[in-house]
């Protein structure tokens, strides 16, 4: 069992800020764990930042299992959280249970489900089975078509009520935490105060119990990123510089240098071997 558990995450509410970052492969997960994050999250955002999709709707269970397995192999300390992709739990509770089990078998410690009140029965069932669940309300990317696109949530009474109802339903169903995405900070603060489980914000202000960002946004791997994401590096430019230099050195015959390859020191030995090989192959 990893050091950080759902129980530990729940105990951090109001005491210590929870840190969460996405990771989609072995090397990024190694670094995230070494950096000390509490939660390493295999998000369905991989559809957009890894596979180039316009949204997360085309992400499959096979993709989530594949990436979860890679991340789980790397992480020794943090809690590994895996997203339930669109279509993996909407049809029925039974279908959701089957797919959640697959992610746990791939190495996840917990699963995340978008939505709250509408999926309370699934959350309750999974928790009873011993599968920890994190909920997700506010802007739910898997339902962005219904929401009218990617936009800030909580701008009217109806949305505030829905967000709070989702969070309370998740709490009652046994979820150990809830993500609040792109929610007005005042609303996120209200939810945080009204539920006993931790709230983890993304684009939802400082009044939550923790924060999550996408790996590629933190490192500046793309030209643009969401307005709520802070860039802590500009690796896109550094990577572009490095690979461009590699290409240039190959074109100019500068790579590989003598320190990057090995050859026979005794050329007579090689020439003898060469002659024998050529003769055997009749070249």
From Swiss-Prot:
Named from the GO MF annotations, one term is:
magnesium ion binding
The main enzyme category here is: transferase
Instruction: Give the superkingdom in one word.
Output: Archaea
Cofactor binding note from Swiss-Prot or TrEMBL: Binds 1 Mg(2+) ion per subunit.
Q: What would be one Pfam family of this protein?
A: Pantoate_transf
Give its localization.
Answer: Cytoplasm
Membership in a protein family: Belongs to the PanB family.
Quote the function comment for this protein. Catalyzes the reversible reaction in which hydroxymethyl group from 5,10-methylenetetrahydrofolate is transferred onto alpha-ketoisovalerate to form ketopantoate.
Q: Which HAMAP family match?
A: PanB
Put simply, this protein is called 3-methyl-2-oxobutanoate hydroxymethyltransferase
